[in-house]
């Protein structure tokens, strides 16, 4: 039951429920990765099961693809569908301009490719992810394994010339071993604390040999849905310049997400 969920889980739940209202029958939908995105995938499964909607999902990770298949969503590759009507994904941070830091789940490369291949990107979040300036959450950077320590040194040297508060990078681990992305790459987490010029940082990072992609998602998000534990949501549409406040009805018998809490 939703009453058994923590306040943060309830907030993610209502954001996901509101976000899937953008999905229409026959759409090709990009499926994000992470705990919040997992709730959204379950909601899509409910639409398929209860309303008979035909939805084609393009997953940004193997674990999202597995979950989507489990709940009845048809999964295809981006090469199969070429272009998407909509992508729904979570975020690790968002600023007032709806710029994002993503990649905490390790799927930033696939997430950025899918988001940029979509007509619209809807981001779901809870209020704890809001910041005045990006950088409190470590910035993930995907790098190739070959020479990664040299790449790390080049990144840290570059950071000394930019307007950031922190300048250290750490290799992401999974247990005692380096974390590997679905592409077999590594992730360096940059501990910057504040990013004054995210566009400049993104450009410079991607020019460093060995860097595949970074977790700055700039000017990509079209709509941000912020869920609250009391069932209210705030919907920010950057293209229309609107901010709307709504309520999502959540039945106390609804238990779609109890088993996917992280």
From Swiss-Prot:
Known catalytic reactions: aldehydo-D-ribose 5-phosphate = D-ribulose 5-phosphate
Keyword terms: Isomerase
Outline the subunit composition.
Answer: Homodimer.
Instruction: Quote the protein name from its UniProt record.
Output: Ribose-5-phosphate isomerase A
The active site lies at 111 (proton acceptor)
Presence of the UniProt keyword Nucleotide-binding in the record: no
Q: In which pathway does it act?
A: Carbohydrate degradation; pentose phosphate pathway; D-ribose 5-phosphate from D-ribulose 5-phosphate (non-oxidative stage): step 1/1
Q: Which gene encodes it?
A: rpiA
Any idea of its EC number? 5.3.1.6
Q: Does the keyword Cell wall biogenesis/degradation apply?
A: no
List the source organism: Jannaschia sp. (strain CCS1)
Q: Which PANTHER family match?
A: RIBOSE-5-PHOSPHATE ISOMERASE
NCBIfam families the UniProt entry points to:
PRK00702.1 (NF001924), rpiA (TIGR00021)
- What HAMAP family would the database entry show? Rib_5P_isom_A
Q: Could you cite one Gene Ontology molecular function of this protein?
A: ribose-5-phosphate isomerase activity
Sequence similarity: Belongs to the ribose 5-phosphate isomerase family.
Task: Give the function comment from the record.
Answer: Catalyzes the reversible conversion of ribose-5-phosphate to ribulose 5-phosphate.
* GO annotation terms (biological process): D-ribose metabolic process; pentose-phosphate shunt, non-oxidative branch
């Amino acid at each position: 039951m939703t009453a058994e969920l923590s306040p943060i889980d309830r907030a993610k739940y209502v954001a996901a429920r509101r976000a899937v209202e953008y999905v229409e029958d026959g759409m090709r939908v990009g499926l994000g990765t992470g705990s919040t995105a997992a709730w959204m995938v379950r909601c899509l499964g409910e639409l398929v099961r209860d309303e008979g909607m035909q939805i084609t999902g393009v997953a940004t990770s193997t674990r999202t693809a597995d979950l989507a298949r489990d709940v009845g969503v048809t999964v295809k590759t981006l090469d199969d569908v070429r272009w998407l009507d909509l992508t729904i994904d979570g975020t690790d941070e968002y600023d007032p301009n709806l710029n994002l830091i993503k990649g905490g789940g390790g799927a930033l490369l696939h997430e950025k490719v899918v988001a940029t291949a979509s007509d619209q990107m809807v981001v779901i979040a809870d209020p704890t992810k809001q910041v005045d300036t990006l950088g409190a959450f470590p910035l993930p950077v995907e790098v190739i394994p070959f020479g990664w320590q040299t790449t790390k040194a080049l990144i840290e040297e570059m950071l000394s010339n930019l307007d950031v508060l922190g300048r250290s990078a750490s290799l992401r681990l999974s247990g005692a071993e380096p974390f590997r992305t679905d592409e077999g790459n590594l992730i360096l987490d940059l501990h910057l604390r504040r990013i004054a010029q995210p566009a400049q940082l993104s450009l410079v990072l991607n020019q460093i040999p060995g860097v595949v992609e970074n977790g700055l998602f700039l000017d990509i998000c079209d709509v941000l849905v912020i869920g609250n534990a009391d069932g209210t949501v705030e919907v920010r549409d950057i293209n229309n310049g609107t901010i709307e406040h709504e309520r999502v009805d959540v039945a106390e018998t609804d238990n779609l997400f109890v088993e996917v809490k992280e």
